[in-house]
């Protein structure tokens, strides 16, 4: 999530005017957001001649609009891991990151691999090698489809709640496309599933639960920052998504489909 932390400063150089606004600021009068107070801003910095740069001060809170444009991407990533609202605003509003789809696919592959690994670990097959190889490959595709359906149900639950509560979620019409991108980006914690599987130990199941909690916390912060809503509504939105996802898991298990994961918080025996 931390890529592009210095892109604003790098792109602004090379303008020949006396004072140059930030990139594309002319085409979008209020493209950016102050990371402190969430107020809209026309630019992040001004580029004077001879490479003299000055960070824009927010007119509302009198603080720098985005201090992170001077930070190293690693620092931004650490702040994002700590779920700081300022880091989330920088990433979501003041940078151009187009890896949402790729990150989503990769996270689903990680989750599918975890489920597939647990499924193979619990099954003992005596069939011929070719048949076993084909069955294992099919199981991986099935785990990927189940993980995708569960994530879709989770997102639908969140969007449904926010749509019902939209008069309370924002003063203006909420940008659900931006929210979807924010949810996909904030699910990056699922990448930790692979190390948890590779370095297997007695506490792997606990680690998987902690990863799940971390992803949910990141989603919670992404919803709160994107829509500028209070913690209660953001928490209820995540809870609604979890509820619909749990119903989907229960449906799969009632159909006697092994979802093959300890990663899910709710299982059939919980109902």
Swiss-Prot record:
InterPro entries: Arv1. GO terms for cellular component: cortical endoplasmic reticulum; endoplasmic reticulum membrane; Golgi apparatus. One of its GO terms (molecular function) is sterol transfer activity. Its main location: endoplasmic reticulum. The chain crosses the membrane at residues 144-164, 176-196, 233-253. GO terms for biological process: bile acid metabolic process; cholesterol biosynthetic process; cholesterol transport; intracellular sterol transport; regulation of cholesterol metabolic process; regulation of intracellular cholesterol transport; regulation of plasma membrane sterol distribution; sphingolipid metabolic process. The keyword DNA-binding does not apply. It is a multi-pass membrane protein. It is found in: Endoplasmic reticulum membrane. Keywords: Cholesterol metabolism, Disease variant, Endoplasmic reticulum, Epilepsy, Lipid metabolism, Lipid transport, Membrane, Steroid metabolism, Sterol metabolism, Transmembrane, Transmembrane helix, Transport. It comes from the Eukaryota. When transfected in S.cerevisiae, it can complement the absence of yeast of ARV1 protein, suggesting a conserved role in sphingolipid metabolism. It is linked to Developmental and epileptic encephalopathy 38: A form of epileptic encephalopathy, a heterogeneous group of severe early-onset epilepsies characterized by refractory seizures, neurodevelopmental impairment, and poor prognosis. Development is normal prior to seizure onset, after which cognitive and motor delays become apparent. DEE38 inheritance is autosomal recessive. Belongs to the ARV1 family. Plays a role as a mediator in the endoplasmic reticulum (ER) cholesterol and bile acid homeostasis. Participates in sterol transport out of the ER and distribution into plasma membranes. This is Protein ARV1. It comes from Homo sapiens.
